Amino acid sequence: MEKKVEFLWLEGRETETLSLPAYETEGAAGMDVAACLDADCTIEPGDIVLIPTGFALAIPTGYEIQVRPRSGLAIKHGLTVVNAPGTIDADYRGEVGVGLINLGRQAVTIHHGDRIAQLVLAPVLQARWTVVTELEATERGAGGFGHTGV
């Protein structure tokens, strides 16, 4: 199933050599997104950097776009999306940026056009809170954080 998302390259950015976010395989859930940089960006271990993409989106109402790490960058270099998954709300119209953190032991340099994250379009359900005096009992109860073993 496809859903239309409006895409705008931002003026004054080096976007001519960039491609639209794209699914790399037929069964892919995420679209790879590239960095839009004026100069290389080196991320030292422990550092967090906001990488621009050079575009803005209009996401349909009732949807979000999740910003997720690329597995190869995470496994090979320790580079991941700092707030994974990040959320781009349907009413946001600014430039999409990707917050990356280097959890590895060596510096990682990002170049213009490098694929830095994945974008996943997902439906959104909004909650309606109901205040109650008691919750329905379950077998699990209040057990959490390791209650089923390691």
From Swiss-Prot:
Pathway: Pyrimidine metabolism; dUMP biosynthesis; dUMP from dCTP (dUTP route): step 2/2. Transmembrane segments: none annotated. Keywords: Hydrolase, Magnesium, Metal-binding, Nucleotide metabolism. One of its GO terms (molecular function) is dUTP diphosphatase activity. The keyword RNA-binding does not apply. Its cofactor is Mg(2+). It comes from the Bacteria. Its EC number is 3.6.1.23. One of its GO terms (biological process) is dUTP catabolic process. CDD domains: trimeric_dUTPase (cd07557). It catalyses: dUTP + H2O = dUMP + diphosphate + H(+). Substrate binds at residues 70-72, 83, 87-89. NCBIfam families: dut (TIGR00576), PRK00601.1 (NF001862). Belongs to the dUTPase family. HAMAP family: dUTPase_bact. This enzyme is involved in nucleotide metabolism: it produces dUMP, the immediate precursor of thymidine nucleotides and it decreases the intracellular concentration of dUTP so that uracil cannot be incorporated into DNA. This is Deoxyuridine 5'-triphosphate nucleotidohydrolase. It comes from Desulfotalea psychrophila (strain LSv54 / DSM 12343). The lineage of its organism: Bacteria, Pseudomonadati, Thermodesulfobacteriota, Desulfobulbia, Desulfobulbales. The gene is dut.
